């Protein structure tokens, strides 16, 4: 299972409109940042000028790494033999500081999103992570879904998925991350991909890459998948295979990445950071760079699903801060698009470190990291489960409605939990007293899991706001650091 979408920026050919709400459906830089920042599930940055529509030449005899009981993954025939030899990666588009988008695509834009926001005062969803199946060929120790191989009852049918897409596009044209489980284990995935394209949404795929063959990579390109996200948690096979609970997984994943790149599909590597691998993060970044991928995103563990069984491996707050500080400095020189995810603290940290360097966090200097915020669950992001439950993110274990019973658009608009998450003034504890709350917000899923209250203070934050300590008022603290407590600075 792969759990991670990124952002766009620092590209001279990336034209972003200044205002949201113009007649042509363009969106502002802030809206684009929120669309492409992602949250919680399978974040996949969208590359500019993607070549994903150009299928590569492939061998007709490519074999499938494993058979699947209810039909081969992605509808690709083949036996249980392994991956072909490594295939060199093709040319890649590089992005830095913020996300990228495919040419001509404006996630969340268009008249429907404009009309929706004008009518309701609520932003339309810019990105939706959709667990199209919970079945998975791996049993990763941190999996938020505790996914396993085999059949899951009640999964949305193709017709139900299409009906939900039809409803979604009445209010937005979002990026839809097809995730799982392992989405390539769903035989009708290409019909889902094509239908998303047809209706004006942008499908991307979060995969563990072990099931990718030359044929599947070619299908990704043929069906215009601009990018996939793939999880790699260790720089070598021993640690990665243990974390993913599957011997040989590392080599299969690397082979899958190379085949996707050879087919012209963009690749993003995601790494879940725990006490097991925090000391190896530089080596994992170097591996990503050596594979010539497009992006490297680090994910901070959220202890849900099987992840709750390794709670002791979640980084303590001080180590959490160290990793995010490393990320701030490393992204300055990384050739990859580099972004922490499930780490809302990062948007506080970049402002603190920038101030120490005598800089202001602006789009010109920091790209779309300056335009987005940490937690976007219920604000411009949400999650759809394999059975149709709607959640703020995949880690937020609270079902706010089900698309089998109620249209997605109504749940997005009417859910009390969603509306609570949109109101920063409701945050409690030190998060409520924090001058950075409108750019960070804390991880609401962690708050729910640890405290039972999604509005409580982020449990894994080391920062002590001056207003919380009684040293000054919230407004005074916010003015001192130059941020708003009600919206983006």
Annotate each PLM feature.
Residues 158-179, 185-316:
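Radical SAM/AdoMet-radical enzyme domain recognition
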Residues 2-4, 8-12, 17, 34, ...:
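Conserved alpha-helical substructure of the radical SAM core
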Residues 2, 318-364, 389-441:
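C-terminal accessory region of radical SAM enzymes
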Residues 427-472:
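Cysteine-cluster motifs in flexible loop/terminal segments that predominantly coordinate metals
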């Amino acid at each position: 299972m792969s759990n991670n979408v990124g952002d766009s920026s620092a590209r001279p050919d990336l034209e972003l409109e200044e205002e949201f709400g113009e007649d042509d459906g363009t969106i502002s830089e802030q809206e684009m940042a929120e669309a492409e920042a992602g949250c919680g599930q399978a974040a996949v940055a969208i590359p500019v000028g993607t070549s994903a529509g150009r299928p590569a030449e492939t061998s007709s005899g490519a074999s499938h790494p494993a058979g699947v009981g209810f039909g081969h993954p992605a509808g690709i025939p083949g036996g249980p033999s392994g991956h072909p030899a490594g295939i060199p990666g093709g040319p890649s588009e590089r992005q830095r500081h913020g996300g990228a988008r495919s040419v001509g695509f404006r996630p969340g834009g268009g008249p429907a999103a404009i009309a929706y926001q004008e009518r309701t005062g609520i932003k339309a969803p810019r990105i939706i992570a959709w667990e199209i199946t919970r079945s998975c060929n791996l049993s990763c120790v941190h999996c938020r879904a505790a996914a396993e191989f085999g059949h899951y009852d009640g999964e949305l049918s193709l017709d139900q998925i299409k009906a939900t897409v039809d409803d979604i596009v009445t209010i937005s044209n979002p990026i839809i991350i097809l995730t799982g489980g392992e989405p390539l284990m769903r035989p009708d995935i290409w019909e889902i991909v094509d239908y998303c394209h047809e209706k004006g949404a942008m499908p991307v795929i979060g995969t563990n890459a072990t099931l990718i063959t030359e044929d599947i990579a070619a299908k990704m390109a043929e069906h215009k998948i601009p990018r996939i996200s793939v999880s790699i948690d260790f720089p070598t096979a021993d640690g990665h295979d243990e974390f993913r609970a599957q011997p040989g997984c590392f080599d299969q994943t690397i082979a899958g990445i190379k085949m996707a790149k050879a087919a012209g599909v963009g690749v993003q590597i995601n790494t879940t950071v725990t006490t097991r691998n925090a000391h190896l993060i530089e080596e994992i970044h170097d591996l990503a760079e050596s594979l010539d991928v497009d992006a490297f995103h680090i994910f901070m563990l959220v202890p849900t699903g099987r992840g709750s069984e390794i709670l002791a491996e979640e980084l303590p707050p001080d180590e959490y801060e160290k990793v995010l500080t490393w990320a701030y400095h490393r992204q300055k020189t990384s050739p990859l698009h580099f972004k922490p995810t499930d780490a809302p603290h990062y948007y506080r940290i970049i402002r603190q470190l920038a101030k120490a360097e005598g800089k202001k966090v602006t789009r010109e200097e920091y790209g779309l990291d300056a335009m987005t915020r940490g937690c976007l669950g219920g604000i411009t992001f949400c999650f759809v489960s394999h059975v149709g439950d709607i959640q703020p993110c995949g880690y937020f274990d609270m079902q706010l409605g089900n698309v089998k019973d109620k249209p997605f658009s109504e749940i997005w608009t009417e859910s009390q939990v969603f509306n609570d998450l949109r109101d920063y003034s409701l945050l409690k504890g030190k998060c409520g007293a924090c001058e950075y709350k409108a750019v960070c917000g804390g991880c609401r899923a962690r708050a729910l899991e640890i405290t039972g209250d999604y509005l409580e203070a982020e449990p894994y934050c080391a920062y002590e706001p001056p207003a919380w300590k009684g040293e000054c008022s919230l407004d005074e603290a916010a003015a001192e650091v130059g941020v708003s407590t009600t919206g983006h600075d």
